[in-house]
Amino acid sequence: MASAATAGLTLLSGGAGIAADIASIVTEQQRLALQKEQIRNNYELGKQTLSLQQQAMENSRDRIRLSAAQIKELGLDPKSELSMIMGLTAGAQPSISAPISSEQLFLNSSNLARSVRWDARNFGEAINTFAGLRAKHQANPSRPDMMLGSDNPNWGARVTGDALSVSGLSVRSNHFGSGSSSLGSLSSVRTNPFSSVSSGSVGGISLRTVGSRPSIRSVFSTTSV
């Protein structure tokens, strides 16, 4: 009888051990399943992070390409500036009255602007008193230049002299002699008074100085004329 009871206790103990082992196996399986799910979630999160980083890089490249295109369009990239300066110093581009000299500047700044010219002689101290900014007529280059902002009395007798005003012409000086940076607009902007020459529109004209002599070595750029 005692041996039968002992056998029964042994059987119960063995069954409890088996049940404990089964529970342990189930718990381990659950832990492994949770760990696997965590690894999968981390993997998906890593993929999303890489995708966002790649998109950010693409956006940065697009912004760089756009900025480079805008700089080139304005003729302010180093290659364009070097070509322009070399052409100016060599007098390669003709003016309406004389070849380009060290006192005259010429810039083909974009495919929208035929040309922008600036006569630096009698250059004033203030932004709105410089002389002789002229815009070439885009549709018919053989027509006379349009006079813009002529405060120089020597130009008053020209056929492109005083006329109606043109809005939206602004000049920015990054270095005006020893003064500080400034932003302003021309107070006297003029166009050809004759109806045969259309004034068109002027936008985004800026003035940048190269070196310390803005009256001779200034660079204009424009986005539309």
Curated annotation (Swiss-Prot):
UniProt keyword list: Capsid decoration protein, Capsid protein, Host cytoplasm, Virion
Keyword DNA repair applies: no
Ranges annotated as spanning the membrane: none
Gene Ontology CC entries for this record: host cell cytoplasm; viral capsid, decoration
Localisation: Virion; Host cytoplasm
Superkingdom: Viruses
Primary localization class, coarse: virion
Disulfide bonds: none
Function text: Minor structural protein that forms a portal-like structure at a unique three-fold axis of symmetry, following binding to the host receptor. The channel formed by VP2 may allow the delivery of the viral genome through the host endosomal membrane.
Remaining remarks: Translated by a ribosomal termination-reinitiation process from the bicistronic mRNA coding for VP1 and VP2.
Domain text: The N-terminus domain points away from the virion surface.
Binding partners and assembly: Homooligomer. The portal-like structure consists in 12 copies of VP2. Interacts with capsid protein VP1.
UniProt protein name: Minor capsid protein VP2
Species per Swiss-Prot/TrEMBL record: Bovine enteric calicivirus NB (isolate Bovine/United States/N ebraska/1980) (BEC-NB)
